[in-house]
Amino acid sequence: MRTLRQTAVARRRAAVARPGPVLRVLLRVEAAALSLWALLLVGVSGGLLWVLGLNYEGITGSAASKIHPATYLAVILIGWTLVRAGNPVIPVAGALNRRPASVLLAACGVALLALIAARGGAGLAGSIDTFVLAGLIPILLMDRDAATLGRLETVFHAVMLANALLGLFELASGQRFFPYRFDGVAFESDTRSAALQGHPLANATLTACYILALAKGGGRLVPMARAAMIGLQLVALVTFGGRSATVTTLVLGSGVGLVALNRTLRTGRIPLAAAAGACFALTLLPVLVAILAAAGFFDTLLDRFVSDGGSAKARVDMLSVFDAIPFRQLLLGPDFLQVNTLRRIYGLEWGIENSIISAVLYHGILVTAVLVIAVGLYLAEVARDCRRGVWLPILAFVILVNTFEGLAGKTTLLAKFALMLIVLFPPLPARGRV
């Protein structure tokens, strides 16, 4: 009798837990919206938005056009999550309890927005896309099932594949389709490929981190597809012109390869498929080298290192700016007009090639320290909920994001990087993901 009663109770609970037809439709719409959001975030740059009629990267145009479409959609999805929960307090409390660093980063973005507005500065939307959007991502993807994360991973791989192919086509054709623009004006002297990520150095940073993530076993690609993707991304990396990204990838990637080779030799087991694939790749290597040489790939690679376009001088000159600003102003935040004037004097119109130094010059030491701590806690929180192997791309990201203006300007780079870590290194089921 007790068994029959327990069975009836279990059936009633299952009926309650089973979503109705309306809810099932809404859940499908939510899944499609998440995939669309990932596509917008990773695949839509400011250059593409300009082609679509939105002046995202300039100072003219409507205020609404200065915020990335992925940010709008992320806010809508967060709002839907609150509505779907029935009691909005529950997901808010869950975010505060389980993603405190993400909440902190988003709050810092809002506070930075208020600070810039109070000081009469420009670029208010930069703090929203750079920090608030990044802070929302771990909250938005919290407790997502494997199928959802798998779809987002597929979108990420597809966009990175298209980005690499478009970068190579831009190199071969000499035409840039979606270059980085400021108020519609592209820098004609910059011949680096832009592809789908807009700024070439941001593209190189994301590509380098993606390569290292794949090298550490991130994602679900089969070995042959993984090796092919790594090779393609390595070739495309050169077209984006990131010398630091190229060197960092080769150094860290070589370390990963040597460790893997040592492990394989110690075990004494080399898979037959891997050996056959290596032999096949070696036979194709001369053909690939000839094709790349004919396309001017190696000339481009050498040119990146022989001529830096004044980048090294700019890194020296940006330190000279500090001599003209009193320490008290550096502590609390120098005058925006003074900083912009000094940039023009020292020939730094293209940007200050270090995220932290640029943030100090525009927001002061105290604000920059808070932002650095918030970003560090954020990356540690994301890494904590990922499986092993995530720290290598994080190390590369920290190195590369400080080789250009990076997080000091308006960018979705941190949000893209967080999405990459979450979908390529999802936690194992044993760690409690539902």
Model-derived segments and their meaning:
Residues 276, 280, 362-402:
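Hydrophobic transmembrane alpha-helices and their immediate junctions
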Residues 153-177, 195-259:
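Alpha-helical transmembrane segments of multi-pass inner-membrane proteins
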Residues 78, 212, 391-401, 408-434:
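Transmembrane alpha-helices of multi-pass inner-membrane enzymes
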Residues 2-87, 112-114, 398-402:
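N-terminal signal-anchor transmembrane segment
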Residues 165, 172, 257-306:
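A membrane-periplasm/extracellular boundary helix in multi-pass inner-membrane enzymes
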Residues 99-110, 119-144:
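Aromatic-anchored transmembrane helix interface
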Residues 56-61, 177, 297-363:
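Long extracytoplasmic/lumenal interhelical loops at the membrane interface
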Residues 85-101, 217-228, 265-271, 377-394:
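Membrane-interface helix-loop-helix junctions at transmembrane boundaries of multi-pass membrane enzymes
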